[in-house]
Regions:
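Conserved ABC ATPase "signature" region
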Residues: 106, 117-135
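Conserved ABC ATPase signature
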Residues: 139-143, 147
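Hydrophobic anchor residue at the start of the ABC signature
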Residues: 153
């Protein structure tokens, strides 16, 4: 599903050495990439989400593919049905044009021009997975940080992506909510044949739910297990 072979990325105007990645994973399930603040986790997450070159300018060399398509070949808007990225700041990922959580979750599927029956099925299933059913009629602006993170993850799940990137997407959740969501997401990925890639600073509890993991250090990836 994701392949990076001696893949080098040098951001525009960067004075640092280029990032150099070797990564290959094709099975459904959940894997993790760990790294300290400033290690380049978000940059790699955005590369894997297909943000280059639209929102991630710079130069790339060597081989990189996402779901079989070379990085940079498919416009970001065309990738939204198959690749989703959830980042650390949930408030920045709300559409800003809906008046309820239910409308927010429906926003993505509606933009795919899906049938109404399919949209309704998705806005039932995604909030159920993330424990957002009691929030369905709340205005997004009234949600707490943890509630907003669960809603944003539900929005991504409602798109039914083959590749879901979660960049510190659990930072505002309680430990209990984090464990619950990891367990459900792991099951969802295996059931649907999708791949979830977690980007986190700390290994606990995430490593317990992952089939494989890497450490991002010195602008490169090192296998952990």
């Amino acid at each position: 599903m994701v392949t990076l072979e001696q893949f080098r990325y040098c951001p525009t105007h960067s004075t640092h050495p280029p990032f150099c990645y070797d990564f290959h994973y094709v099975k459904p399930g959940m894997v993790a990439i760990f790294g300290d603040n400033g290690s380049g986790k978000s940059t790699l997450a955005q590369l894997m989400a297909g943000w280059y070159p639209d929102f991630l300018p710079g130069e790339i060399t060597c081989t990189g593919t996402l779901l079989g398509t070379p990085i940079g070949r498919l416009p970001l808007n065309e990738q939204s049905a198959t690749i989703q990225l959830v980042q650390q700041s949930p408030y920045l990922q709300l559409s800003g044009c809906t008046f309820s959580v239910e409308e927010e979750v429906a926003f993505g599927p509606e933009n795919l021009c899906l049938a109404e029956k399919e949209i309704m099925a998705r806005i039932d299933a995604a909030p159920a997975l993330t424990e957002c059913q009691p929030l369905r009629h709340r205005h997004p602006a009234t949600l707490s940080g943890g509630e907003t993170q669960r809603v944003v993850i539900a929005c991504a799940i409602a798109m039914q992506p083959k590749l879901l990137i979660l960049d510190e997407a659990f930072s505002r959740l309680t430990p209990q909510a984090c464990e619950m969501l990891l367990q459900r997401l792991q099951h969802w990925a295996l059931e649907r044949g999708s791949l979830i890639i977690l980007f986190e600073r700390h290994r606990t509890p995430f490593l317990n739910y992952c089939q494989q993991a890497w450490q991002l250090q010195n602008r490169a990836l090192k296998p952990l297990c």
